[in-house]
Amino acid sequence: MAGSVWLSADDLSVMVDPKADFSKFKTFAVRVGKIESNRPEIDNVLFAKRLTKTIRTALMAKGLKEATGRPDLFVDYSIASEDINTTQRGGGRGIGPQPLRFTVGMLVIDMTRPGDQNPVWRGVYRDDEMTGSKLFQKLPEDARKLIARYKAD
């Protein structure tokens, strides 16, 4: 497999507060997201707006309504990304280590009741992509996949 590159598969996890009654949550408000990235295509206001819209649309598709007043849930998200430069073993005899560069992105979405610091729902998505541009394209879909795991009952 000379010249092939292997990256780990995307990793997704969702945690819920077992004591929370999700049937009572009818409205939400998305707050300003937190982005920590040295990738300009990810760390910018336009991308934050795009991701916020994606999260909002996905929640409405799950039956929640965006609050005009006090919401049942505050939705916060954060993104961190890091460029990784490493090496991988050569693919055959006499082939030395090959450079391997990729970008790791971590998307966290928290849903919290007003006045509470602890989330009732947390989704975490880790995405490894060959470039920051590819991560930029994938993160909104990653957010949709996380919200798809939200159960309102």
List each model region and its residues.
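Short beta-strand
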Residues: 66-68
